[in-house]
Amino acid sequence: MKVLVALSGGVDSSMSAKYLLEAGYSVVGCYMKLHSKPGYHEENIRKVKKVGEFLGIETHILDLEEEFNAKVYEPFVNAYKEGLTPNPCAHCNKNIKFGALWKFAQTLGCDKMATGHYARIEDGLIKVASDLSKDQSYFLANISPEILPYIIFPLGDKFKVDIKAAAAQIPQIAELASQKESSEICFVETTYIDILNKHFNTLMPGVVRDVSGKVVGKHDGYMRYTIGKRKGFSVDGAHSPHYVLKIDAAKNEIVVGLKDELSSFSFTTTNFNNFTDKNELECFVKIRYRSTPIPCLVSKLDDGATVKLKDNAGGVASGQLAVFYDEFDRVLASGFIR
């Protein structure tokens, strides 16, 4: 069976290719060039070619910059303009890594594709990785259900510390074991504000209101804030921390309140991505990557869903991905918070 492995030049994808070879698969590697961040690709491509030579596999460089720009980068920028808090990795996984790359894999005659993500597939569903500290099931929950039968996650049942230790024992790829892990959005050089400043004037002072509509302070520009943020704005006479509750992009205003005013017991989603055949789900939801799962009831509604929480959630942010899990840590569905 022929498998295409997405190679990044990092230890996880490189070891994934090695494990697949050892399991008897015919492996081909591919590095995706997604953006023009200065100095980003040259070193990665060198490492990918070195890994390919060591493993004896064919490697390809696939330029997907135009598609990435249209499907990930531009929506990211425009989301902030609309006062939303985007999740570019969720869009990238759906449209690029498990979209455009899979199409390329098929042109090479591949039967399946693999990545170095920490996640598992169980009974046709994405499942949380064994290494909970590295689990990436949340970011994978927006991919098309139709592609799941064609995906392999070689690291799903492994632990990062063991992967790095194993790589460190292999002279040809030992350098990958000690390199710094990437944790930021790949195309962001410093902060997301630096990206937005290339397209907009984000420094636009405006007013801060409380939940009653009263003007209580000033802010530096609505794009500089996300739901739940507690710094960077003034609140006259405040003795307790205040948090951003709402962003009004059209008026360049933010609404703030005390921590208990952040709480929500319900929300709705768009782009409901259902991995089951059920229109109602009693499950658990994560409203952010590292948030604690909350018991909930989900009801499909047109292309979205309504979500009723059994416990309150703080900081439900429009544009973020809500991911729904069953009691066995498997992804049942996802949707973008409205």
From Swiss-Prot:
InterPro entries: MnmA-like, MnmA-like_C, MnmA-like_central, MnmA-like_central_sf, Rossmann-like_a/b/a_fold. It catalyses: S-sulfanyl-L-cysteinyl-[protein] + uridine(34) in tRNA + AH2 + ATP = 2-thiouridine(34) in tRNA + L-cysteinyl-[protein] + A + AMP + diphosphate + H(+). The record marks 117, 320 as: Interaction with tRNA. Belongs to the MnmA/TRMU family. It is found in: Cytoplasm. Keywords: ATP-binding, Cytoplasm, Disulfide bond, Nucleotide-binding, RNA-binding, Transferase, tRNA processing, tRNA-binding. The keyword 4Fe-4S does not apply. Its EC number is 2.8.1.13. The keyword Calcium does not apply. This is tRNA-specific 2-thiouridylase MnmA. It comes from Campylobacter fetus subsp. fetus (strain 82-40). The gene is mnmA. Its main location: cytoplasm. SUPFAM superfamilies: Adenine nucleotide alpha hydrolases-like. It comes from the Bacteria. Catalyzes the 2-thiolation of uridine at the wobble position (U34) of tRNA, leading to the formation of s(2)U34. PANTHER family: MITOCHONDRIAL TRNA-SPECIFIC 2-THIOURIDYLASE 1, TRNA 5-METHYLAMINOMETHYL-2-THIOURIDYLATE -METHYLTRANSFERASE.
